[in-house]
Amino acid sequence: SGLCENDIDVVFAGDLLNQCIGSSFSLREKQIPFIGMYGACSTMTLSLINAAVFVESGAAIYAAAVTSSHFCTAERQYRFPLEYGSQRPPTSQWTATAAGADIIGLGENKPYIEYATVGKIVDLGVKDANNMGAAMAPAAADTLISFFKDTNTVPEDYDMIFTGDLGKAGTDLFYELTEREGIDLRCRHSDCGLI
C-alpha cells in the first residue's frame, strides 16, 4: 500500500477467539487505535464495512480491516477440541487457518466499496452445531435479497457473488431460499467453503 504504520488511523480486527485475543496480541505493540470485531464468519465483512464508514465519514483517512482464523481454535470454540476425537459429519465446516487485511482510504482506484447491507438474524431453528451452513443460509439469503432491493441491482450486475462458509448443505438451502424470491444465483455465486 506504500503506507507506514502511523498513516493508519484505526484498525478494525477480529478473529475466532474469545476477547479477540489473537487480534489484541498482534496489535499490542502498535500505536494504532484498535476496535475489536467479532462476527465469526462475517468478521472480515464487518471490519470492511466499519472501516469504510469511518473513512467515508471523515473519522479516518486510512482504516485497516483485518481478520484471522485458525482451524484448531475454531474447533475448540465452536465444536469439539481435536483431542476429544469426535467424528465429523459431512455437514461440518472446515475453518481455514488464514489471515487477511485490507487498507481502506478515499480514492478513485478500484476495487472500492460502493454499497453495504448489514444482515439481520434469521433463525429457522437449526440446532445442529455441525451444520452451521444451514444455520447461516437463511440470514445470508435474506441479506442478499435485501441488498438487491436496496441497490436496485440483480445478480447479472456482478461478476461473482461470494458467501463465506455455507458449505454444500448451506449453499443448497441458500439457493432454495433465494429462488423462492425469484433470484437465481447458480451461475454467479460461489461459496468459499466449497472452493
Please give the residue ranges for each predicted region.
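Claisen-condensing/thiolase-fold acyl-transfer catalytic domains that form or cleave C-C bonds
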Residues: D9-V10, G14-N18, S23-Y62, S69, ...
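Condensing-enzyme catalytic core mediating Claisen C-C bond formation in acyl metabolism
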Residues: P81-I145, D150-T153, C187-I195
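Phosphate/pyrophosphate-binding loops at sites that engage ATP/ADP/AMP, CoA/4′-phosphopantetheine
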Residues: S1-D9, T143-D157
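Short, mixed-charge aromatic SLiMs
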Residues: Q19, H70-Q77, D123-D128, K168
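Cofactor- and metal-binding active-site motifs of prokaryotic enzymes
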Residues: S26-P33, A52, E56, C72-W94
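Short hydrophobic/aromatic-rich motifs at helix boundaries and adjacent loops
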Residues: C20-S24, C72-T73, Y115-V118
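Short, well-ordered loop/turn elements at secondary-structure boundaries
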Residues: A59, T97, P155-D157
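Short, hydrophobic/amphipathic alpha-helical packing segments
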Residues: S1, M44-L48, A137-I145
